[in-house]
Amino acid sequence: MRELTLYQVDAFASEVFTGNPAAVCPLEDWLPDRVLQGIASENNLAETAFFVAKDDGFHIRWFTPESEINLCGHATLASAFILFEKLDWGQEIVTFESKSGHLSVRLGDDVLILDFPSQPGTLCETPKALVEGLGCEPSEVLACEDYMAVFEREEDIVHLNPNLDALTQLDLRGVIATAKGKDVDFVSRFFAPKVGINEDPVTGSAHCMLTPYWAEKLDKAQLKARQLSKRTGELGCELKGERVFISGKAVLYLEGKIWI
């Protein structure tokens, strides 16, 4: 049997039991996809990140309990946290190659800063399954890798009680529900039952779509965001050209061994 080290990190959090938990599994070389998927399913967290050293950085992949995905912000933040805090990465920036291209994470002042691609959405017709799934009609809907449903008030986001069966009928990965915030610039929630995530606690990748939208609406490049899941999470977002910089903290919850 092969022994692997496994970490669990609460990302976009300053204390345990908040933010978004992610499993991180460093590898010396790639295991078969069925094994990676098996580990992620056994972990049963929203995402498990795996990375392998490549040149002067790393190749990273992310799996939900159901499938591999193209981009995951909080598990990337968690992976960088492990490299900086546990694996003695001696530089201020760690770079990752992924299915979504080149990503990097930089040590900031008491935070980690993700450098991700901006993913602006395109206005689209409101899918029937989206309205059935959210239980109400948004003021507008945009599409990219996910649908983004925009509402008028923060309370609209708080009170959503989604029909998950209806949301699984959508053709895209999931639904970001968002509105202007009261004491932050914008708030959101994220639902992706199609890939095994009923509600994600804090979704870094969703802010690649949220940030360009709200930067234009509010006419500001630096934004404060809050995800209104039960665990909640705080993010700093900045739009610079075609890149989005997402900042947050992380804390270690678990370190252990698995045998496969």
What do these predicted ranges mean?
Residues 1-71, 77-260:
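Active-site proximal loop and beta-alpha junction motif in alpha/beta enzyme cores
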